[in-house]
Amino acid sequence: MPKVDLQAIVKHCDRELRINEIVDYEDAHNGLQVENGGKVHRIAAAVDASLATICKAADMGANLMIVHHGLFWNPQHPWTGKKHDLITALIENDMAIYSAHLPLDLHPRHGNNAGLCKALKLKRPK
């Protein structure tokens, strides 16, 4: 299976989604949140980076998840309990996490709102 450099994908997503131009919530972090070993052979997408979605992505053979709701939202607390399980699953599966919250909401072509407008066949949405 061919592999692609993780940083090449990150650069592409950062540029396409204008990660550095969109101001998000104070503690939200858009972009690469967790690195893997540096190579990507399959990408999974999910709304949330949860233990369930990470395990499902790993079961599908993915080692990069692109998510709308990433891991970092609030000032961080200790990674114990469920958070420990989540980080363990990421490491054991060499899974990278890339998150785009408001950049994905606002994107005129790839964004969630753009997709919804297209699905509803809305003409000239504002």
Predicted segments with their positions:
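Hydrophobic structural segments
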Residues: M1-K126
